[in-house]
């Protein structure tokens, strides 16, 4: 009996070592590239011992999931109870869990700590939980990653395990299919393949836009400027570095300093702007304002810098430097609803252009905020009233507003069903007060304006990342960095190919020519891999009759067309910013 127990302990220890080895390896590289040799070397266990318990690395991961599923089937009740702060600290010290002790020690002395028990497993958790494990029908461990304790690079790196569960297996399968599609669309992978941007270790979190990426970015900015000019906005540009005094006035120094980059100039404290708003206040104050000047809609494509922890950086989605498409609208109280409606209409135009559906959320006052209860109530009801007047469905997020005012957030749904928060409308009565903004009313008296902060794209860089994944790199023609690729069949047709290229460029179409001495099939495939909307094959027949053979990303072989006909068709597609639907997939 004693020998059997001892053997069981050894087996448990061996399996634990193998699981820990797999966990460490999954932090370092993709799961698919991990071999049994990697695992046994990491665990310092021989191969024979590994195979005594598992067929391969996949079997090891599946056994971990199987153990989880076994717990689910046991239909274990999940019970909640509380301990005093002192008892909770003593409990976890006995269990040798210093991280949980540290969390509890940060809580007030009179705090009651909630615990949850599931079978023999007990843990600290705020909850709430299910009543039992039974409703969890489908489980999948998706990945593991390293994470510094409390997000601080100076602390020990721990293992973060990612998993997902659904009440039905079909829902899990649908989610896993979406994950696979997301991997194919990863903007970091496509950004490199399509030559759009790069990231360097010399500037972590600071993206480098390459020539094609700059074409894409500038095309978006041109659209932004055109749209805002039509909507009655003026554009300004404010400095990147501004004095500490400004940030103290705005409240950022007290509420946001940990995310700001600071420096000294001539012995004075300065900060690189994390937001465009305070500079916009100075623009408003630069001259006297009258009620006749309001609403004043001021837009800025401002470069901002925010310190993000290295573990939170992610391609273009989470960076330390980005262009914010801010606008500040200064208005009278009577103009609030109409201006909010105008902003909603503008944001709807932007998202509709790219085929995004969206839902709306209203976020209210957070714990760390400034301003009176009366101001917050008035601002919140202003946003709520506008949404109600527009007949928009919305969800209320209590306590999730900005520190200076409530906000409306727009959450986009992309082509594979993921949601992204982009557009924001924030009603602010605090900054106009802190900066002592005024206008002369119809009564000749001085009044304080109300202000809206709003963004449509949000971060331009992040929006580009979203677009790359939404379109899988296959951008609409108007947005594509290269819209047409001219493909001469052989060197004999280079001269005609150049003539076609010159005609396209003269019409304002972004075009390139492939002059390499490669087979035409290879050239076509290369252009397809670069997601180029149109390929024009030119040979002897095309040259003789001033034609082009058109292949498109949307319909495959579209046959021969006159060059003038093709140019007219594509310039119309670009001018109207049309999105052609794919009717035939290219092989």
What do these predicted regions represent?
Residues 2-6, 27-31, 44-45, 51-61:
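HTH DNA-binding helix-turn interface
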